[in-house]
């Protein structure tokens, strides 16, 4: 009895020790001795950097964390490497998400990460920063006014208030919200510091300016006190050279980001801004703003690193600025870890490699805790090595995580999941591999037998390291039963299969080479012998790729007449169909192949290596390399061009005019100066015109002086003491260089000396000359020519125009007003005798409005009355009339006052019956009583019209009823409204027809309500 108790105690102690050891292994990490479907945590959502607006009304912020695991994971959070006390009422958990109530900058700003764990291990999320965003208001102090001479450059400082983060956007208000300044070549708002730059100040810049700052991160905007800008007039503005005042600094950018460089110059005339990458072509993703002041490079790459230059130039001088863009890269995986199962006692090298700039360092976590740095190699693994591993690659720009679970396997050999095939087929003379793949850990030893004979390696037989059996040069005697025996320290197992030998597959009719022209057909023959017990399939491939006959049935067809025939028909062959065709005859056991080449003759392929050299104003030299002639000699080349003005390619004139097929250089001539071009080259042979080359890089031809004169020169009219000159602006293609503008020359018709003025806006077609001594309607000769930095163009034809007339000096007389209704009056007057009257202007305003808010109506000079509509009822109005012409309006007439009538009745007549009587309907309604502020009812208007039409017969009556004829066909509408001195009131209507007396809605409403007995007649 004592021995039995002692034995039981030892068993219990041993069981507890084993159980505790098993539990320790199961806490973090897992050894597998049987099928295991559980797994450790895998993150599906991780926290991200979050900015919480300090003024947010929400009062809480969430950091997300969600992992998939079996069993379900448990979550906890850490901040600045310290555990978060989730028992505090400031924190709560929703699933794995952390919710912070009433966030406090002093307590809650920091770095957070989430831990997810189950009995397979623990993983740590990526780190996320919680910060607090704010944008303070501008100081309340008034900003001093700025005075600048016209023609001089200037800067208005924004001086944004304290803020976080830095991603502000800037705009400037002019005089009031929301009138924002539009940026152009003369005005620029820097998104770096918010300042407003004006290259040269004009009189039109006068106003009050305010810097408007927005923070997209916290959706808040503020604006500064207004800054008065006062341009000081100059008799003549002085030109001065370009001076770059907005300069970009060296930039460190991450690969994939968008980079913005700013460059703006002061100067008079307004400088042109050009960008280039020093010694290298500009990135293909670079874009330059319309004004030229901003260069944006989208999705920047490592090869975009380099020195960038901005050059500003006007006709007084140029300025340059350079800085470097350094492109670095966030860590990116080259090779990372994945969930892995390894046999107990084996070695493991777990590769984890990342690239980036700077080169990332590698560190490891195991179950959420620091474990190792650099390469990870495990030797003679045990269950203690199981768990959740994380490889972290990090550089100065951030970190990336790769998570994986390591399971340790210890299993006796078993073929339950992957037994050997019961029947294995192999062709005589061929090769076969019989797989033996049991599940076992550690790796077992392998033995093979055929029948009762043990197999060993020989010249024909090879047992692979993974246990597979390879037999070469198969004979009929190799058929039989094969068994694979496996054993490790956990147990033994075996599996058996039968090898059956078949006849080999052989090509007996091989395809032969063919030579055709584009559009012709070709046939590739193919036939094979094979084991009659098997099914034969033919597979055709083209240049190594299997032909998909479903997708490519337009050009490829097969002959299915005979099982042993795999003939291929190629229809309407194109150049792309030239190449090597391979026929493969295959069964489930073996295959045999044969190939042939197809030559397709056709138009030439695209020329290559196109280069542009010796760029001049109207010509460029091109060189290229010969492309494929597709088996027919090239007879000539054609150069084609495309400009920014059109998307169409056009044949260019060349020198020589005909480019022979043996040439690889020519010159494109008769080009437009200072125009952006692309070029391509097309080859031709006797079989047609080939594909064009890849277009060249865009180039700009050299500048030249304009050689086209503006057209449609004319003008005249305008305000008093003005000479207005107009012309049709030259389109962009005729500018020929930068700083394009116009020189306008004019003189009195009989004068000797031409007066010349310069107009710098290339898009304008108008100039107004003001001269207080100019006489009205004076004849002038005018002409216009274009200019740029290369020189002047020819003058246009001379046109004769007249200066503006004087405004009329007389006021209209006998102005009278007739009140028509509550919303309309009629105004009439005596005409002005002066011949220079072109129109009359009637100004009118209500007594409660200011005269400055007066409405205006313009009528032709032949009219002596006007109707004013949409007036307010029962309101006093003031009216005056002026005579006008192109120079302006003359003095006003005496002011006349009048009162509009009271408003018409607002209540519609209530129709009480619609009764048929013989051949007519009698419509009856209640009397409308006007309110105290409405005009008295003087009668009623009745409109009798077909339904769906606006016109009909109008009746007037003082009664409360009317008789209308019965419609012969269709429905009619009877509209009734009260009439008064103030106009017509609101309408009531009823529908009638030859078949019914009331609309259904009125019939159902009126008869019960009024107790009217109506006889229906049909």
UniProtKB/Swiss-Prot annotation:
<feature type="domain" description="Fibronectin type-III 1">
    <location>
        <begin position="606"/>
        <end position="704"/>
    </location>
</feature>
<feature type="domain" description="Ig-like C2-type 3">
    <location>
        <begin position="241"/>
        <end position="326"/>
    </location>
</feature>
<dbReference type="GO" id="GO:0098609">
    <property type="term" value="P:cell-cell adhesion"/>
</dbReference>
<keyword id="KW-1015">Disulfide bond</keyword>
<keyword id="KW-0325">Glycoprotein</keyword>
<keyword id="KW-0130">Cell adhesion</keyword>
<dbReference type="Pfam" id="PF00047">
    <property type="entry name" value="ig"/>
</dbReference>
<feature type="domain" description="Ig-like C2-type 1">
    <location>
        <begin position="41"/>
        <end position="131"/>
    </location>
</feature>
<feature type="disulfide bond">
    <location>
        <begin position="263"/>
        <end position="310"/>
    </location>
</feature>
<dbReference type="InterPro" id="IPR003599">
    <property type="entry name" value="Ig_sub"/>
</dbReference>
<feature type="glycosylation site" description="N-linked (GlcNAc...) asparagine">
    <location>
        <position position="473"/>
    </location>
</feature>
<dbReference type="InterPro" id="IPR003598">
    <property type="entry name" value="Ig_sub2"/>
</dbReference>
<dbReference type="Pfam" id="PF07679">
    <property type="entry name" value="I-set"/>
</dbReference>
<dbReference type="InterPro" id="IPR036992">
    <property type="entry name" value="Contactin-1_Ig1"/>
</dbReference>
<keyword id="KW-0336">GPI-anchor</keyword>
<dbReference type="InterPro" id="IPR003961">
    <property type="entry name" value="FN3_dom"/>
</dbReference>
<protein>
    <recommendedName>
        <fullName>Contactin-1</fullName>
    </recommendedName>
</protein>
<feature type="region of interest" description="Disordered">
    <location>
        <begin position="698"/>
        <end position="718"/>
    </location>
</feature>
<feature type="glycosylation site" description="N-linked (GlcNAc...) asparagine">
    <location>
        <position position="208"/>
    </location>
</feature>
<dbReference type="Pfam" id="PF13927">
    <property type="entry name" value="Ig_3"/>
</dbReference>
<feature type="lipid moiety-binding region" description="GPI-anchor amidated serine">
    <location>
        <position position="999"/>
    </location>
</feature>
<feature type="glycosylation site" description="N-linked (GlcNAc...) asparagine">
    <location>
        <position position="591"/>
    </location>
</feature>
<dbReference type="InterPro" id="IPR047100">
    <property type="entry name" value="Contactin-1_Ig3"/>
</dbReference>
<feature type="domain" description="Ig-like C2-type 5">
    <location>
        <begin position="413"/>
        <end position="500"/>
    </location>
</feature>
<keyword id="KW-0732">Signal</keyword>
<feature type="propeptide" description="Removed in mature form">
    <location>
        <begin position="1000"/>
        <end position="1018"/>
    </location>
</feature>
<dbReference type="InterPro" id="IPR013783">
    <property type="entry name" value="Ig-like_fold"/>
</dbReference>
<dbReference type="InterPro" id="IPR047102">
    <property type="entry name" value="Contactin-1_2_Ig1"/>
</dbReference>
<keyword id="KW-0393">Immunoglobulin domain</keyword>
<dbReference type="GO" id="GO:0098632">
    <property type="term" value="F:cell-cell adhesion mediator activity"/>
</dbReference>
<feature type="disulfide bond">
    <location>
        <begin position="436"/>
        <end position="484"/>
    </location>
</feature>
<feature type="glycosylation site" description="N-linked (GlcNAc...) asparagine">
    <location>
        <position position="494"/>
    </location>
</feature>
<comment type="function">
    <text>Contactins mediate cell surface interactions during nervous system development. Involved in the formation of paranodal axo-glial junctions in myelinated peripheral nerves and in the signaling between axons and myelinating glial cells via its association with CNTNAP1. Participates in oligodendrocytes generation by acting as a ligand of NOTCH1. Its association with NOTCH1 promotes NOTCH1 activation through the released notch intracellular domain (NICD) and subsequent translocation to the nucleus. Interaction with TNR induces a repulsion of neurons and an inhibition of neurite outgrowth.</text>
</comment>
<feature type="domain" description="Ig-like C2-type 6">
    <location>
        <begin position="504"/>
        <end position="601"/>
    </location>
</feature>
<dbReference type="InterPro" id="IPR036179">
    <property type="entry name" value="Ig-like_dom_sf"/>
</dbReference>
<feature type="glycosylation site" description="N-linked (GlcNAc...) asparagine">
    <location>
        <position position="338"/>
    </location>
</feature>
<feature type="domain" description="Fibronectin type-III 3">
    <location>
        <begin position="811"/>
        <end position="906"/>
    </location>
</feature>
<dbReference type="InterPro" id="IPR047101">
    <property type="entry name" value="Contactin-1_Ig6"/>
</dbReference>
<feature type="domain" description="Ig-like C2-type 4">
    <location>
        <begin position="331"/>
        <end position="407"/>
    </location>
</feature>
<comment type="similarity">
    <text>Belongs to the immunoglobulin superfamily. Contactin family.</text>
</comment>
<keyword id="KW-0472">Membrane</keyword>
<keyword id="KW-1003">Cell membrane</keyword>
């Amino acid at each position: 009895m004592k021995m039995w108790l002692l034995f039981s105690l030892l068993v219990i102690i041993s069981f507890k020790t084993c159980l505790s050891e098993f539990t320790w292994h199961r806490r973090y990490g897992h050894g597998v001795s049987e099928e295991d479907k559980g797994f450790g945590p895998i993150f599906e959502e991780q926290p991200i950097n979050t900015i919480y607006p300090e003024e947010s009304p929400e009062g809480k912020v969430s950091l997300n964390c969600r992992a998939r695991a079996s069993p379900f994971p448990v979550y906890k959070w850490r901040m600045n490497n310290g555990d978060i006390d989730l028992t505090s009422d400031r924190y709560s958990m929703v699933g794995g998400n952390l919710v912070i109530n009433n966030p406090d900058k002093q307590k809650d700003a920091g770095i957070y990460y989430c831990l997810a764990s189950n009995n397979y291990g623990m993983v740590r999320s990526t780190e996320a920063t919680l910060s607090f965003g704010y944008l303070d208001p501008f100081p309340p102090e008034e900003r001093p006014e700025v005075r600048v001479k016209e023609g001089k450059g200037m800067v208005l400082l924004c001086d944004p208030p304290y803020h976080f983060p830095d991603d502000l956007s800037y705009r400037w208000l002019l005089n009031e919200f929301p009138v924002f300044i539009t940026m152009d070549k003369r005005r620029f708002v820097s998104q770096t510091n918010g300042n407003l730059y004006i290259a040269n100040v004009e009189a039109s810049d006068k106003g009050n300016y305010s810097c408007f700052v927005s923070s997209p991160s916290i959706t808040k905007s503020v604006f500064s006190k207004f800054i008065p800008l006062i341009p000081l007039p100059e008799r003549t503005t002085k030109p001065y050279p370009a001076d770059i005042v907005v300069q970009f600094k060296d930039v460190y950018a991450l690969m994939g980001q968008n980079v913005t460089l700013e460059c703006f110059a002061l100067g008079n005339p307004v400088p042109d801004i050009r960008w280039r990458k020093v010694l290298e072509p500009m990135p293909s993703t670079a874009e330059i703003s319309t004004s030229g002041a901003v260069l944006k490079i989208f999705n920047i790459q490592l090869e975009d690193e380099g020195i960038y230059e901005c050059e500003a130039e006007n006709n007084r001088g140029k300025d340059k600025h350079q800085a470097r863009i350094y492109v670095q890269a966030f860590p990116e995986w080259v090779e990372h870890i994945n969930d892995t199962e390894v046999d107990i006692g084996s070695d493991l090298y777990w590769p984890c490699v990342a690239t980036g700039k700077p080169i990332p360092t590698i560190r490891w976590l195991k179950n959420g805790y620091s474990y190792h740095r650099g390469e990870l190699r495990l030797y003679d693994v045990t269950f203690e090595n199981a768990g959740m591993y994380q490889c972290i690659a990090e550089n100065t720009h951030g970190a990336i995580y790769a998570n994986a679970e390591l399971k340790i396997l210890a299993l006796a050999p078993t073929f339950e999941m992957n037994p050997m095939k019961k029947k294995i087929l192999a062709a005589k003379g061929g090769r076969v591999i019989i797989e033996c793949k049991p599940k076992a850990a550690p790796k077992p030893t392998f033995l093979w037998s055929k029948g009762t004979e043990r197999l060993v390696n020989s010249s024909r037989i090879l047992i692979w390291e993974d246990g597979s059996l390879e037999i070469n040069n198969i004979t009929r005697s190799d058929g039989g039963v094969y068994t694979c025996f496996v054993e490790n320290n956990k147990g033994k197992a075996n599996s058996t299969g039968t090898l059956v030998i078949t006849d080999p597959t052989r090509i007996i009719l091989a395809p032969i080479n063919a030579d055709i022209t584009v559009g012709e057909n070709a046939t590739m023959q193919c036939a094979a012998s094979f084991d009659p017990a098997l099914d034969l399939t033919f597979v055709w491939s083209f240049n190594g790729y299997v032909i998909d006959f479903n997708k490519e049935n337009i050009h490829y067809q097969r002959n299915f007449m005979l099982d042993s025939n795999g003939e291929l028909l190629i229809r309407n062959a194109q150049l792309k169909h030239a190449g090597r065709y391979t026929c493969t005859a295959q069964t489930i056991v073996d295959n045999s192949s044969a190939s042939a080449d197809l030559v397709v003759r056709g138009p030439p392929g695209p020329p290559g290596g196109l280069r542009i050299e010796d760029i001049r104003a109207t010509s460029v030299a091109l060189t290229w390399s010969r492309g494929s002639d597709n088996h027919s000699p090239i007879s000539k080349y054609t150069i084609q061009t495309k400009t920014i003005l059109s998307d169409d390619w056009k044949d260019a004139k060349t020198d020589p005019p005909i480019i022979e097929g043996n040439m690889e250089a020519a010159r494109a001539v008769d080009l437009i100066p200072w125009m952006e071009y692309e070029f391509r080259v097309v080859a031709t042979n006797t079989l047609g015109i080939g594909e064009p080359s890849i277009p060249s890089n865009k180039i700009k031809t050299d500048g030249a002086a304009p050689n086209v004169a503006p057209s449609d020169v004319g003008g005249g009219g305008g305000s008093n003491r003005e000479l207005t000159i107009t012309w049709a602006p030259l389109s962009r293609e005729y500018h020929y260089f930068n700083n394009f503008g116009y020189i306008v020359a004019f003189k009195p018709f009989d004068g000797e000396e031409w007066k010349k003025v310069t107009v710098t806006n290339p898009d304008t077609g108008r100039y107004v000359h003001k001269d207080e001594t100019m006489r009205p309607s004076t004849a002038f000769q005018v002409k216009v020519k274009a200019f740029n930095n290369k020189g002047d163009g020819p003058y246009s034809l001379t046109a004769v125009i007249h200066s503006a007339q004087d405004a009329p000096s007389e006021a209209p007389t006998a102005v009278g007003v007739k009140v028509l209704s509550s919303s309309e009056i009629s105004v009439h007057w005596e005409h002005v005798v002066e011949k220079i009257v072109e129109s009359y202007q009637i100004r009118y305003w209500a007594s409660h409005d200011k005269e400055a808010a007066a409405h205006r109506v313009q009528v032709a000079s032949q009219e002596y009355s006007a109707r004013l509509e949409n007036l307010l009822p029962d309101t006093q109005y003031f009216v005056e009339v002026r005579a006008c012409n192109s120079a302006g309006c003359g003095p006003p007439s005496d002011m006349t006052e009048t009162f509009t009538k009271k408003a018409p009745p607002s209540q519609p007549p209530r129709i009480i019956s619609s009764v048929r009587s013989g051949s007519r309907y009698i419509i009856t309604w209640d009397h409308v009583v006007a309110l105290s502020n409405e005009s008295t009812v003087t009668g009623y208007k009745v409109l009798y019209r077909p339904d769906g039409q606006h016109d009909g017969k109008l009746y007037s009556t003082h009664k409360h009823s009317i008789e209308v004829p019965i419609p012969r066909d269709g429905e009619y509408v009877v509209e009734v409204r009260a009439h008064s001195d103030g106009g017509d009131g609101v309408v009531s209507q009823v529908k009638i027809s030859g078949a019914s007396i009331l609309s259904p809605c009125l019939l159902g409403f009126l008869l019960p309500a009024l107790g009217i007995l109506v006889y229906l007649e049909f």
